[in-house]
């Protein structure tokens, strides 16, 4: 089971899935908030809980992958995760226990912004942290940040940092990552993710 990273989708595995499928059944899925999946309103921990909102967090994404493995795959599974998908793969493997054959991490997210790692931050970042957290909770600000990031030129710049060789950073990949940013709810998924400060 292939688990994508932040801002990505199942199609991000377009080359890997084809190769892996030639030797074993291979699945890639869109995590809630990404790709073609639903993008419900974000539920930040201090906000009133409603059934329409979603708490974008590693536990919930891991539960999604766990349920997928149990209901669709129905056999022992190898989990492969990229970036935040790596964190989700690790959490899912704990839930699956013996049904997890193993985990492969590709450029696993370090979660350096997590509150548990605050002591590792510079003095300036520790001082600014409460201010940053207050600002990114505001929908107006998070929507504006999202609107800046949800552009093909910005996506291309990020891809070139992530893939310095530039191999496979093509129009198809850029469009694959750009298209979901135009769907209803995408700014809410972004808001939910950028507010993950205590979740691993």
Where are these regions (language model features)?
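Active-site signature of alpha/beta-hydrolase-fold catalytic machinery across serine-
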Residues: 15, 91-95
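Conserved alpha/beta-hydrolase catalytic His-Asp/Glu region
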Residues: 139-200
